[in-house]
């Protein structure tokens, strides 16, 4: 399947939050490592679907920053991305503190738990508004860079097309660029 043929559907944050809460609760209440591992497999499929939707929207926005639909989708994910990160972190904490951790480490590896430990140290829900602001500013910057129009030598170029002048063997042309 070609990238352009991949169907895009915006995630429903209410459904996403409900599913994260369900997975977290079921993981907490699991009666065995096997049960937690099966829930973990569901978690991986669920997060893969969420991430696919997010990535499709972001890539399509990067391809054409003037597309209003994907600009709105990008803005949406700038807002909800940190909230999703919070749920992923909550799930990670439950997994990390699992009484069945030895079994889980044998199934999914110790590196996963080291990554969870690092993520736990790096994330605090107090920074969600800052993460949202950072996402919005990064998107705005990317759009400015992508839509820059630079008059040069009687033509108008974007930044990527200016590269050929900036790397020209002609020193005077490089200086002007």
Residue ranges and their predicted role:
Residues 1-177:
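A well-structured
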């Amino acid at each position: 399947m070609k990238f352009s043929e991949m169907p895009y559907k915006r995630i429903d944050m209410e459904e996403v939050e409900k599913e994260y809460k369900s997975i977290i609760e079921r993981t907490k209440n699991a009666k065995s490592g096997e049960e937690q591992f099966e829930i973990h497999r569901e978690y991986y499929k669920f997060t893969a679907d969420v991430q696919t939707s997010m990535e499709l929207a972001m890539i399509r926005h990067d391809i054409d920053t003037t597309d209003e639909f994907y600009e709105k989708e990008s803005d949406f994910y700038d807002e909800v991305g940190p909230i999703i990160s919070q749920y992923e972190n909550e799930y990670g904490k439950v997994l990390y503190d699992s009484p069945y951790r030895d079994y889980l480490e044998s199934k999914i590896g110790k590196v996963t738990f080291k990554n969870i430990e690092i993520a736990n140290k790096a994330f605090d829900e107090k920074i969600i508004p800052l993460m949202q602001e950072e996402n919005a500013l990064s998107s705005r910057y990317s759009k400015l860079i992508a839509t820059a129009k630079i008059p040069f030598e009687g033509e108008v170029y974007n930044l990527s097309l200016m590269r050929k002048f900036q790397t020209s063997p002609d020193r005077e042309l490089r200086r002007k660029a």
